[in-house]
Amino acid sequence: MGTRLLGCAALCLLAADSFHAKVTQTPGHLVKGKGQKTKMDCTPEKGHTFVYWYQQNQNKEFMLLISFQNEQVLQETEMHKKRFSSQCPKNAPCSLAILSSEPGDTALYLCASSQ
């Protein structure tokens, strides 16, 4: 049963660095069990003030979860408000956390930045 729970919510992350971008996302891959907290970090390109977190689900659909300008939230989905936590402090990596993982969280999570 423990193995089944462990494989319940596999979270894949794409390190943008592999595309020669200046955005760094860690960790590169996560596997979490149901109910576990999950945290991902994103270091935007130097000088960029906008940060975006996206989720690409198993149907290959992209959805913006949250966006920041500097430390302020610009857009936030209802799903993010209910199940996620994010922050983007000055001079530190931005983070995206899933408060309690569920099987439906199996997805590719992407961070992007712009000026």
From Swiss-Prot:
Residues 1-21 form the signal peptide. Pfam families: V-set. PROSITE patterns: IG_LIKE. Probable non-functional open reading frame (ORF) of V region of the variable domain of T cell receptor (TR) beta chain. Non-functional ORF generally cannot participate in the synthesis of a productive T cell receptor (TR) chain due to altered V-(D)-J or switch recombination and/or splicing site (at mRNA level) and/or conserved amino acid change (protein level). Alpha-beta T cell receptors are antigen specific receptors which are essential to the immune response and are present on the cell surface of T lymphocytes. This is Probable non-functional T cell receptor beta variable 23-1. One of its GO terms (biological process) is cell surface receptor signaling pathway. Alpha-beta TR is a heterodimer composed of an alpha and beta chain; disulfide-linked. The alpha-beta TR is associated with the transmembrane signaling CD3 coreceptor proteins to form the TR-CD3 (TcR or TCR). The assembly of alpha-beta TR heterodimers with CD3 occurs in the endoplasmic reticulum where a single alpha-beta TR heterodimer associates with one CD3D-CD3E heterodimer, one CD3G-CD3E heterodimer and one CD247 homodimer forming a stable octameric structure. CD3D-CD3E and CD3G-CD3E heterodimers preferentially associate with TR alpha and TR beta chains, respectively. It is found in: Cell membrane. GO terms for cellular component: plasma membrane; T cell receptor complex. Disulfide bonds join 42-111. Keywords: Adaptive immunity, Cell membrane, Disulfide bond, Immunity, Immunoglobulin domain, Membrane, Receptor, Signal, T cell receptor. It comes from the Eukaryota. It comes from Homo sapiens. The keyword Signal applies. The lineage of its organism: Eukaryota, Metazoa, Chordata, Craniata, Vertebrata. Residues 22-115 form the Ig-like domain.
